Amino acid sequence: MSKVVYEGWMVRYGRRKIGRSYIHMRYFVLEPRLLAYYKKKPQDYQVPIKTMLIDGNCRVEDRGLKTHHGHMVYVLSVYNKKEKSHRITMAAFNIQEALMWKEKIESVIDQHQESQVPNGQQYVSFEYKSGMDTGRTASSSDHESQFSAAEDEEDSRRSLMRRTTIGNGPPESVLDWTKEFDAELANQNSDNQAFSRKHWRLLQCQNGLRIFEELLEVDYLPRSCSRAMKAVGVVEATCEEIFELLMSMDGTRYEWDCSFQFGSLVEEVDGHTAVLYHRLLLDWFPMIVWPRDLCYVRYWRRNDDGSYVVLFRSREHENCGPQPGCVRAHLESGGYNISPLKPRNGRPRTQVQHLIQIDLKGWGAGYLPAFQQHCLLQMLNSVAGLREWFSQTDERGVHTRIPVMVNMASSSLSLTKSGKSLHKSAFSLDQTNSVNRNSLLMDEDSDDDDEFQIAESEQEPETSKPETDVKRPEEEPAHNIDLSCFSGNLKRNENENARNCWRISDGNNFKVRGKNFGQEKRKIPAGKHLMDLVAVDWFKDSKRIDHVARRKGCAAQVAAEKGLFSMVVNVQVPGSTHYSMVFYFVMKELVPGSLLQRFVDGDDEFRNSRLKLIPLVPKGSWIVRQSVGSTPCLLGKAVDCNYIRGPTYLEIDVDIGSSTVANGVLGLVIGVITSLVVEMAFLVQANTAEEQPERLIGAVRVSHIELSSAIVPNLESE
């Protein structure tokens, strides 16, 4: 193998013949004359899945941002202009990685072009500008492309417009306010230092932001349309990190944008342009003022100086009509300008400008100045939210997601549909993302390709290898086991608002150790469970309840009759009345040599050093959430655990009362247990690279448990 210029995990992106897109992880290797990718990191002389010869005729086409099942990826296409049918399309979950690959590939292409100059075979040099000076034209090189060979002239013009990160340029209806501002900057001189005061005045300083108002009066806008206002602030993060966060409309947005209630993708026009639906949360006398929503086109580009521009303007769309219970506001102009500043004390700094000119419509917008002012300031304060989010967050590798607006794109949507149904769909966002995270994708290049989970591969690409290199029976899906024969006295209910019930938690709600955790200290979403949770019992008695797996007719006994292995976790709650919540996890068989098998058949010392619990409290008072926390805990080190190894099961009796600290937390929890929703994940801690990544034994969510629903079990020995 020749010298490697650059290598690493990237996403393969494309569309199948039926038009459905696909993405999956592949290991890309760039050499001085070759670009290739493999299913996994190549060893020795492994044959790649696909290769492309790199020479001076090759080009890197930036296709911008694409959405697949709510996951946004940044797409590059590498091709030879003499043979356009042969190309490699690659993508990354973050724009930094995509730009790094683009730079590396273009540097290799440039070296080949320079080497051809002495021979008289000169290639056109493509040093692309941002397109700021030429309007809709990407660069002067695009004009030179018109003189290429006749057979590829049309395709060349079409693709060269996409080779920079500006796409086709903003739609004609979208006002590029950043372009006008830059032009004014270029024209200013030392005698006109107050040029900015001609158009903007400082209105106030709030939350560390400077709030400006445009001075220009316009006659063509309605009275209810505000003057343009902008907020300017500094965020300690890179332009790329801020840009990726701005482009997302998932649950993370609630943490920094106080005016955001719900957002969704209506149409993806191209890699730089999309139509979005956005419902605002303005919280101004909601009993008398209806909520506002928007349908707008969003365009973005990256400039040569590393800055980003995101532009908004309202538009009508056939799949995004007016919604019952909402007033459709009109966004005359708006967006973000994200510009890099010099680092300070080793920390990146970025100036963020957020501009809004909006007509809120409705009866109150033109006659209640306080309403207009309140709403504008609330939206502009998102810049302060960005600043605080980055200052308080260590994890920067968040995946941006935009849920596809299924309901609005459907022809079955009726304007007479109640506002309640739309409200319900808006708050099913987390459920939608949960399904998206669990979707499995396959490669069109191989019918027997290995599956992987997006959420894991985004964080740590190599974490998919232990799950894909070896097919384990313990990873078989749940539908291979008939779950209908198992039952417990606590009922299962998938309804979000159900009470006194349980359901299986999404494994991706929990972070576990990824591959090479010892070196990189990186955690990943847990993904699929190793075992199936088939039943939950809720018991009470005057004494502590031990060894429940011996009870005739319990789920562990039913599993044994069917030749299945079960793990029983008995969480014992002390008090004047002793309670036990018992979870029954089932699988077909233990895999010899696996970490789970070594845990089941190991001694108590090994088990105590490895059994781990990850708690979550999605619903509950602040003090309970703080007391319980979400930090993983080695159960055997924190409380007393009694292990009972039966022929076809392992029971773990967890005595919460054996720990003073746990007892204190329990005192808080028991008093408000009916108002709590608690999630618990059980796993075996993986300490070495061979054991990693960690896998959940199982996870459960219990909701609003009633103490009175517990029953006294019959534990008479057979």
Swiss-Prot record:
Its main location: endoplasmic reticulum. One of its GO terms (molecular function) is phosphatidylinositol-4-phosphate binding. Residues 180-392 form the START domain. Coiled coil: none annotated. The keyword Transmembrane applies. The chain crosses the membrane at residues 664-684. The keyword Transmembrane helix applies. It comes from the Eukaryota. Keywords: Cell membrane, Endoplasmic reticulum, Endosome, Ethylene signaling pathway, Hypersensitive response, Membrane, Plant defense, Transmembrane, Transmembrane helix. Residues 442-461 have a biased composition (Acidic residues). Gene3D superfamilies: 3.30.530.20, Pleckstrin-homology domain (PH domain)/Phosphotyrosine-binding domain (PTB). Disruption phenotype: Enhanced disease resistance salicylic acid-(SA-) dependent to the biotrophic powdery mildew pathogen Erysiphe cichoracearum at a late stage of the infection process and characterized by the formation of necrotic lesions. Enhanced ethylene-induced senescence phenotype. In edr2-6, exaggerated chlorosis and necrosis response to attack by pathogens (e.g. Residues 3-110 form the PH domain. It is found in: Endoplasmic reticulum membrane; Cell membrane; Endosome membrane. It is a single-pass membrane protein. GO terms for biological process: ethylene-activated signaling pathway; negative regulation of leaf senescence; plant-type hypersensitive response; regulation of defense response to fungus; response to ethylene; response to salicylic acid. Signal peptide: none annotated. Residues 134-174, 437-483 are annotated as: Disordered. GO terms for cellular component: endoplasmic reticulum membrane; endosome membrane; plasma membrane. Pfam families: EDR2_C (PF07059), PH (PF00169), START (PF01852). Expressed ubiquitously in all tissues and organs, including leaves, roots, flowers, stems and siliques. Residues 462-479 have a biased composition (Basic and acidic residues). Negative regulator of the salicylic acid- (SA-) mediated resistance to pathogens, including the biotrophic powdery mildew pathogens Golovinomyces cichoracearum and Blumeria graminis, and the downy mildew pathogen Hyaloperonospora parasitica, probably by limiting the initiation of cell death and the establishment of the hypersensitive response (HR). Prevents ethylene-induced senescence. Binds to phosphatidylinositol-4-phosphate (PtdIns(4)P) in vitro. The pleckstrin homology domain (3-110) binds to phosphatidylinositol-4-phosphate (PtdIns(4)P). This is Protein ENHANCED DISEASE RESISTANCE 2.
